[in-house]
Amino acid sequence: MLSNPKRTRFRKQHRGRMKGISYRGNHICFGRYALQALEPAWITSRQIEAGRRAMTRNVRRGGKIWVRIFPDKPVTLRPTETRMGSGKGSPEYWVAVVKPGRILYEMSGVAENIARKAISIAASKMPIRTQFIISG
């Protein structure tokens, strides 16, 4: 899976703030089962990948998984024990900005109990409270 954008217009971004709920990406589009965020957070590319791997390992063949979020925000960090000033730190990792209501993963092609189990394992990898939802 692609863990960061191929190219961006600017190397560094402001942190911004997460207010309100997600109006886009809050409906199931591709699969039958989904994992929905209940809290706002930054989810790193590593966390997204860990969740995807956990789900894939759990459903094995048969199931199809869609990742509905993409880490497109660079997070900068200053080197440790560095004095303040002399500009902004260098980009260290990428995050996806997630608001409440956003669908993180979708799944289809498996029984509900298997999907519930796989999605709960993926949910434990996330830094936020989530819920399992079924389309229809």
UniProtKB/Swiss-Prot annotation:
Xref: InterPro entries: Ribosomal_uL16 (IPR047873), Ribosomal_uL16_bact-type (IPR000114), Ribosomal_uL16_CS (IPR020798), Ribosomal_uL16_dom (IPR016180), Ribosomal_uL16_sf (IPR036920)
HAMAP family according to UniProt: Ribosomal_uL16 (MF_01342)
Source organism superkingdom: Eukaryota
PROSITE patterns given in the database record: RIBOSOMAL_L16_1, RIBOSOMAL_L16_2
GO MF annotations, alphabetized: rRNA binding; structural constituent of ribosome
Record's keyword annotation contains Ribosomal protein: yes
GO biological process, one term: translation
CDD domains: Ribosomal_L16_L10e
Compartment(s) where it occurs, according to its Swiss-Prot or TrEMBL record: Plastid, Chloroplast
GN (gene name): rpl16
Protein name, per record: Large ribosomal subunit protein uL16c
Record's subunit section: Part of the 50S ribosomal subunit.
NCBIfam families recorded: rplP_bact
Keywords annotated in UniProt: Chloroplast, Plastid, Ribonucleoprotein, Ribosomal protein
Family: Belongs to the universal ribosomal protein uL16 family.
GO cellular component terms given for this protein: chloroplast; ribonucleoprotein complex; ribosome
